[in-house]
Regions:
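Structural preference for solvent-exposed beta-strand-turn elements
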Residues: 2-258
Length: 258
């Protein structure tokens, strides 16, 4: 017996290329073999002339906002990330896609002469974070951050027994009244260290950024040239730039002194 949930139906139009870019980023977050069906889905929210796309694997949350879309009816749903990505990929560039939440379990996509029906799951089941990250914020240039990540990620360890080496150690240090954001990684055979000079002192607790987060962040930064807002609280970190937000859990452990 199918359970129905009552939610305002949703109807909107969106540019294919913007949606494809957003869904493409989501592919790196979604776990292909998740035991929870909802984690194979993307959350789609149409509200205030914007479309918000969210993907998570519980350790990593990625959100992208597509602004200035035509919304006939606001609403939200979740649908398979892999299937919607595959469909949008095959739709010609420059097209407009119409979305219509026909009922609580069916999202209809229409573009040119093609029509597709996607299965949906209740958006209220989608796990979201509600932490307040408004402390310890600082800005850093995206190109500089990508540079230090690329210089250090080659030394990340794959040894699962030493989880504290399965990422990049990020910390702020001071030298001759100058402050640097320093990245370090080691697999115990080799070590890579790179640093960025900061404009002023920042409050930033030392963290170990997980490997998956690093790969996702690298792909997001590749086509960016702007300031990124970084803030961390307890066991999580948030990167905010343009219309994208990446929130990640951190590796719990102590990076070796070097």
């Amino acid at each position: 017996r199918i359970k129905f949930y009552t939610k305002k139906k949703m109807k909107f139009k969106v540019d294919r290329d913007q949606l494809f870019k957003s869904l493409n980023y989501c592919q790196g977050v979604i776990e292909k073999r998740s035991t929870l069906p909802i984690l194979s889905n993307v959350l789609i929210e149409a509200k205030n002339s914007s479309l918000k796309i969210t993907a998570t694997d519980l350790d990593l949350i990625f959100t992208n906002l597509i602004k200035d879309i035509k919304i006939e009816k606001e609403g939200s749903t979740t649908t398979s990330a892999a299937i919607i990505y595959d469909i949008v990929r095959k739709i010609p560039s420059g097209s407009e896609i119409n979305f219509n939440l026909v009922n609580d379990n069916k999202l209809q996509m229409e573009s040119q002469k093609s029509k597709f029906n996607l299965l949906c799951l209740n958006p209220s089941e989608f796990p979201l974070t509600d932490e307040n990250f408004n402390t310890n914020e600082f800005l850093i240039n995206s190109k500089l951050l990508l540079k230090v990540i690329n210089k250090t990620k080659i030394s990340i360890s794959n040894d699962e027994t030493r989880h504290y080496l399965n990422g990049i150690f990020l910390h702020v240090n001071e030298k001759e009244k100058n402050f640097f954001l320093t990245a370090a990684a080691t697999d115990s055979h080799r070590m890579s260290v790179s640093k960025i000079k900061l404009e002023s002192k920042v409050n930033f607790d030392p963290i170990i950024l997980p490997k998956k987060t690093i790969h996702q962040l690298s792909s997001l930064l590749e086509d960016q040239d702007q300031n990124i807002k970084i803030c961390n609280i307890k066991s999580k970190i948030k990167f905010e730039f343009g219309q994208s937000v990446l929130i990640s859990k951190l590796i719990d452990g102590k990076f070796p002194n070097y």
